[in-house]
């Protein structure tokens, strides 16, 4: 069973000073650290750049056992683990890009209980070799941290179905541990509206969680939405925007790999030194682009949503959405990468004119997104009629190769329960598909066309009340 933390609060502050060099916590770090030290479940919604990593790293380092950090992206894991190793802390990571010798060294360190923090993706956590090691009765596990928890909501019903199985992890691990063992769960994210908060809490089976919600308002971010009447006009608006900001660091977000490559080629032809970044690049190519941008060799990157999470650069002066994201939570995440040094930063979104007559690109993207959501649900319902009522996921996937996403959708619909991370039970052959993603897409569309203060819209959308007369005074609708 877990040994209690016996340090006084003075000891905790002393550890903060000794490890990171900070004299004291920023609000509300102290309350969050105290919650995690007390091994209570929690949901933390904290804007990017708010110092969230310390909130779970410090409690983990003060305990004698292991804390698991479930993280969505390799870059995110590598950055945090590298920082901890530079501080001489016992942290490691497991992911598919490791060499066999690196992987073996981490598994041995895990087996010998030499780690305090282990970073891994949901898929790696649920891989047979790693799961077997974690279920060792002698391995003390204190907590499970879900970093970037909004990914559970955004990706769990589509291309990262393993997220939907995380709610069964705690109970399964506890069955392998000595009586009296306690494993707490904390979910951290920068963006979660009330519906997303409910989904995260429900899927993870959080037990009476303490909820910390920090206002996402950033007075130094100036949001603007501009209509691009034609595809050529969209490019010209981007060009004009960049030319007005020579030698400034920025990011350009697009929707697809092809968009990233085509726009990079066009910008290069217009004399800019930039790079295309997307999930189709090799790990080495991605790291090289990240290093070039962080080191100032290139001022801006043309990227998909694959870029930015966990990559911290304080002097980003602008973010352009060449195409608007589908979800408001994605938008807030991505604009949050600008102005982390507190200095003013401009965030621009380019959209097609509302009718789509002159430029149908945005309308076509929205239609495609809605059709894909509908098609996935149809496939899931068809598969539900063929699947065994109870089954083991790896066995089922061999017989039905595309069933992992279908199972996650059935879970989202309330038709399926995970008995443990690997075994499911279908309780109903029909269910009501949640409208989460389509609702969120509609909300994004409303944001782009609203006439009221953009920050007021964002705050209200994420569950923060504002007075009727409140205005930010620095978005385009307020006349910035």
Q: How does the language model describe each region?
A:
Residues 2-45:
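Conserved pre-motif I regulatory segment
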Residues 38-44, 65-66, 114-116, 183-184, ...:
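Pre-Walker A (Motif I) flank of P-loop NTPase domains
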Residues 38-58, 70-71:
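Walker A/P-loop
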Residues 68-69, 74-120, 273-276:
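Conserved nucleic-acid-binding Ia/Ib motif block in the N-terminal RecA-like helicase ATPase lobe
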Residues 99-143, 153-157:
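Conserved helix/coil segment N-terminal to the catalytic DExD/H
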Residues 135-143, 150-213:
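Post-DEXD/H (motif II) to motif III coupling segment of the RecA-like Helicase ATP-binding lobe
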Residues 222-266:
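Conserved interdomain hinge at the start of the Helicase C-terminal
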Residues 249-253, 257-259, 265-282, 286, ...:
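C-terminal helicase lobe
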